[in-house]
């Protein structure tokens, strides 16, 4: 039998939609897993090292100014009521406090490394302060 060319014709009759099987319908209605993108997870320690490099580059203050100011005023109220501070005085106190804390954590890290650890512990902090000659 010879082949004949078929041409597209517009359908005149309206067909009723077929009912889908329950399993097939459930698969179609379920969200596609490819559409939801999971957040990228870095390996443990990668973000910490990035933060260390970031904060070693910067020279700005690490503690927020207003909470530190409230802390200074709260401690000063215990000593003497009705005491005033210049903004430069609080800024100088904050610079000194941050320099002290950074140095203390450096010494604490050295104590942890001396104990063949990479995680600092309270005993490292106590040892660093003891070597410095501070009370705790």
UniProtKB/Swiss-Prot annotation:
Entry protein name: Histone H3.4
Induction: Up-regulated in the absence of H3.3.
Subunit-structure text: The nucleosome is a histone octamer containing two molecules each of H2A, H2B, H3 and H4 assembled in one H3-H4 heterotetramer and two H2A-H2B heterodimers. The octamer wraps approximately 147 bp of DNA.
SMART domains: H3 (SM00428)
Pfam (any one): Histone
InterPro entries cross-referenced by the UniProt entry: Histone-fold, Histone_H2A/H2B/H3, Histone_H3/CENP-A
Bilayer-spanning residue ranges: none
Cited function: Macronuclear replacement variant which replaces conventional H3 in a subset of nucleosomes. Nucleosomes wrap and compact DNA into chromatin, limiting DNA accessibility to the cellular machineries which require DNA as a template. Histones thereby play a central role in transcription regulation, DNA repair, DNA replication and chromosomal stability. DNA accessibility is regulated via a complex set of post-translational modifications of histones, also called histone code, and nucleosome remodeling. Functions redundantly to H3.3.
């Amino acid at each position: 039998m010879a082949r004949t060319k078929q041409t597209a014709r517009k359908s005149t009759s309206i067909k009723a939609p077929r009912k889908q099987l329950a399993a097939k319908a459930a698969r179609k209605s379920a969200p596609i897993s490819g559409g939801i993108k999971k957040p990228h997870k870095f390996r443990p320690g990668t973000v910490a090292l990035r933060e260390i490099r970031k904060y070693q580059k910067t020279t700005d203050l690490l503690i927020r100014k207003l909470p530190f100011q409230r802390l200074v005023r709260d401690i000063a109220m215990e000593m003497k009521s009705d005491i005033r501070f210049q903004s430069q005085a609080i800024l100088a106190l904050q610079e000194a406090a941050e320099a002290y804390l950074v140095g203390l954590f450096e010494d604490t890290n050295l104590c942890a490394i001396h104990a063949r650890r990479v995680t600092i512990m309270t005993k490292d902090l106590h040892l660093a302060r003891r070597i410095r000659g501070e009370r705790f």
